[in-house]
Curated annotation (Swiss-Prot):
Stated name of the protein: Transcription repressor OFP17
Misc. comment: Plants over-expressing OFP17 have no visible phenotype.
GO biological process: negative regulation of DNA-templated transcription
Keyword Transcription regulation recorded: yes
Ranges where the OVATE domain occurs: 130-190
Top-level taxonomic group: Eukaryota
Cited InterPro entries: OFP17, Ovate_C
Organism: Arabidopsis thaliana
Length: 195
């Protein structure tokens, strides 16, 4: 019984001290706050009471600061750089995001251009050589299949090929299509190349 009384006494002291602490942070509202006006309004529903505040909202001050900042930036002189830009180009550049096309025009380097074109040409030549080798190997494979079907008449191989073609038509993911194409291209090149 005595433990219960002590516990109740401790609880009341704790709650009083917490209430005092919370009262420091409590603020009083002049008008009651209702949840209904805070909810999102649908369509043309207008609030019942429109309160006009005598003070300006903070948003109008922030908008003013933002517009003056843009005005200052447009009037400011730009730094000198290795490329020349007209004033209208500079204002367009400042007001619109930098697209890759404009970045390429503005920041092209004469040193890297020939090197990049040479590497691009060598990569394209290598790709066309590999593509031609794969196409030749695939043509040899097709000729082999035609020879197999016509002369030997093996129906089991024909059914396997039809199943393979059916699975190929049902592939949807570009990653798998690329993987299967590369695998069969290399297989055809290894087995049926003319070398």
């Amino acid at each position: 019984m005595r433990v219960k009384a002590t516990l109740i006494n401790f609880k009341s002291k704790l709650s009083k001290s917490c209430n005092r602490f919370v009262s420091l942070f409590r603020f009083r509202v002049k008008r009651p706050v209702f949840i209904r006006p805070l909810r999102a309004r649908h369509g043309n529903v207008k609030p019942r009471h429109q309160h006009h505040h005598s003070k300006k909202p903070i948003c109008s001050c922030l908008c003013f600061l933002n517009s003056s900042k843009n005005h200052k930036m447009s009037n400011a002189k730009h730094r000198s750089s290795s490329f020349s830009v007209n004033d209208d180009d500079y204002s367009k550049f400042m007001q619109s995001p930098l697209t890759p096309a404009t970045a390429k025009k503005l920041f092209t380097s004469p040193i890297t251009t020939p090197y990049s074109s040479r590497t691009r040409k060598s990569l394209n030549a290598r790709d066309t050589f590999e593509d031609n080798a794969v196409e030749d190997a695939c043509r040899s494979f097709e000729n082999y299949l035609i020879h197999l079907i016509v002369e030997e008449g093996k129906i089991d191989d024909l059914m396997d090929i039809e199943e393979l073609l059916f699975c190929w038509k049902n592939l949807k993911s570009p990653v798998f299509i690329e993987l299967v194409s590369r695998f069969y291209g290399e297989l055809c090149r290894d087995l049926f190349s003319g070398e």
